[in-house]
C-alpha cells in the first residue's frame, strides 16, 4: 500500500485563496466605511474587487446620507479632477450624489461616461454651476436614470426636455427652486416619461400646472408647494387619475373658493394625503367636493384655511370616514359648531392638530376631549406631511 504523508493531504487555504465572487460577497456585507477602506488596502486584487463592487457614492458635503458606507472620506470641495479620478475608479456605480458640490460645472459631468448606463440615481442638489449643457451631458451618458434631483440647479425647459427624451425610465424627479422651468418643461417631462411616479416642483414660480395635462396614470405624488397654480393646472396635475399624494400648500391667489372642486370630481379618488396648508382663499365649495369625492383620504392639512366655515367642517365630519390625521391649526373660522361636526363624524380620526383657533371656546375643546377620547389632540403645527418624494416610489 502506498504511503501517503500527512503533508500531502494538508492543502494550505486562507481567505486570500477565495474566488472573486466570494470576496465580492464578503465586501458587500461590510457595514462601516473603515472596513471598506481596509478591504481595498489589503492587496491590488482586493482593491479591484472593492472598485467593481461599489454601487453608491456620495460626499461629506451631501445634504442627506443615502447610505453611510457610500460616503467618500474627502474634503467638501469636490473638484472636476477629483470627480474624474473617482468615477474612473468606481465604474459600476448605480447611485451617485453630488449634492453640495458647488464648485462643479457643466464640463465636470463629462466623467459620467464611466458609470454611464449603469447609473440609476443622480443627485445634483445645489450644484449651482450645472446648467442645460450639463444636463445634456447627463442625457447622453446616463439613459437609464430613474431618480434625478436638480434642486436649485440652473436648468431650463430646454435642459429638462433633453433629459426627459433621453431618460424614458424616469420615475422620481425633483425640480424644486428651479425658476427657469415652466409648464413647457413639465409638459415634455410628463409626456415623454410614462413611468413617472413622483415630481417635486416646490417654489417653481413659472409653473401653473397645465403642463401635467394628460400625464401618465403612474403619477401618484406631486409636491407643488408655493407654486403659481391655476384652476386648470390643478386639473392637469390630477388628470392621470393615479394621484395619491398632493401638496399644493401656499397656492396662489388665482385659486378661489371653488377653485379646488375638480379634485373632488372623481378623478382623484385614490388621493390619500392632501396638503392645503395656507390655502387661505379656498372655501366650503371645494372642501365639500373633496370630502365627498376622495373617500380614501387619510391625512388632510387645512391649517390656515381661513375661508373654511361651518358647512365645510360639516362635510369633513360627514364624508371623511377614513381620515386618520386632520390639521386645523389657526383656522379663523373653525368655531364650536364646526368642532362639534368633527367630533360627531370622522369616526376613524386618530390625531387632530389644533392650536390658535380664536373662535373655539375652552368648553367646546373640553367636550371634544370627553366625547372623543380615541383622538389625540396635538398643538404643534406640521409644515410637511406624508412621505418623502424619494421614498414614494419604493412604497
From Swiss-Prot:
Renumbered ranges of LRR repeats: 75-100, 101-126, 127-152, 154-177, 178-203, 226-250, 252-278, 279-304, 305-330, 331-356
Keywords: Leucine-rich repeat, Repeat
Keyword Nucleotide-binding: no
All copies of domain F-box, residue ranges: 13-61
Family matches, as SMART domains: LRR_CC
Pfam families named among the record's database cross-references: LRR_6 (PF13516)
Name by which UniProt lists this protein: F-box/LRR-repeat protein 12
The species this protein was found in: Arabidopsis thaliana
Gene name tied to this protein: FBL12
Amino acid at each position: 500500500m502506498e504511503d501517503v504523508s500527512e503533508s500531502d493531504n494538508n492543502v494550505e487555504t486562507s481567505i486570500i485563496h477565495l474566488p472573486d465572487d466570494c470576496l465580492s460577497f464578503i465586501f458587500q456585507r461590510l457595514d462601516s466605511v473603515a472596513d471598506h477602506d481596509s478591504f481595498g488596502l489589503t492587496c491590488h486584487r482586493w482593491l479591484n474587487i472593492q472598485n467593481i463592487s461599489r454601487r453608491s457614492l456620495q460626499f461629506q458635503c451631501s445634504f442627506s446620507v443615502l447610505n453611510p458606507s457610500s460616503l467618500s472620506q474627502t474634503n467638501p470641495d469636490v473638484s472636476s479632477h477629483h470627480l474624474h479620478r473617482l468615477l474612473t475608479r468606481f465604474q459600476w456605480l448605480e447611485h451617485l450624489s453630488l449634492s453640495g458640490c458647488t464648485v462643479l460645472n457643466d464640463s465636470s459631468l463629462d466623467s459620467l461616461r464611466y458609470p454611464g448606463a449603469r447609473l440609476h440615481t443622480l443627485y445634483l442638489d445645489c450644484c449651482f454651476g450645472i446648467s442645460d449643457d450639463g444636463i445634456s451631458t447627463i442625457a447622453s451618458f446616463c439613459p437609464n436614470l430613474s431618480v434625478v434631483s436638480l434642486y436649485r440647479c440652473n436648468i431650463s425647459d430646454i435642459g429638462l426636455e433633453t433629459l426627459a427624451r433621453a431618460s424614458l425610465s424616469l420615475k422620481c424627479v425633483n425640480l424644486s427652486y428651479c425658476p427657469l422651468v415652466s409648464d413647457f418643461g413639465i409638459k415634455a417631462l410628463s409626456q415623454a416619461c410614462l413611468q413617472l411616479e413622483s415630481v417635486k416642483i416646490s417654489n417653481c414660480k413659472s409653473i401653473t400646472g397645465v403642463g401635467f395635462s394628460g400625464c401618465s396614470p403612474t403619477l401618484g405624488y406631486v409636491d407643488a408647494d408655493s407654486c403659481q397654480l391655476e384652476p386648470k393646472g390643478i386639473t392637469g396635475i390630477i388628470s392621470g387619475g393615479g394621484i395619491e399624494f398632493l401638496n399644493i400648500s401656499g397656492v396662489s391667489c388665482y385659486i378661489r373658493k371653488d377653485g379646488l372642486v375638480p379634485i373632488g370630481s372623481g378623478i382623484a379618488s385614490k388621493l390619500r394625503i392632501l396638503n392645503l396648508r395656507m390655502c387661505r382663499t379656498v372655501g366650503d365649495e371645494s372642501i365639500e367636493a373633496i370630502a365627498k369625492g376622495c373617500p380614501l383620504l387619510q391625512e388632510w392639512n387645512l391649517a390656515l384655511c381661513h375661508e373654511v366655515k361651518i358647512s365645510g367642517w360639516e362635510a369633513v365630519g360627514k364624508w371623511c370616514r377614513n381620515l386618520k390625521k386632520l390639521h386645523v391649526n389657526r383656522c379663523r373660522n373653525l368655531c364650536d359648531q364646526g368642532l362639534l361636526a368633527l367630533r360627531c363624524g370622522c369616526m376613524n380620526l386618530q390625531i387632530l392638530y389644533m392650536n390658535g383657533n380664536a373662535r373655539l371656546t375652552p368648553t367646546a375643546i373640553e367636550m371634544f376631549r370627553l366625547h372623543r377620547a380615541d383622538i389625540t389632540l396635538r398643538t404643534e403645527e406640521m409644515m410637511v406631511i406624508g412621505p418623502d418624494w424619494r421614498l414614494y416610489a419604493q412604497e
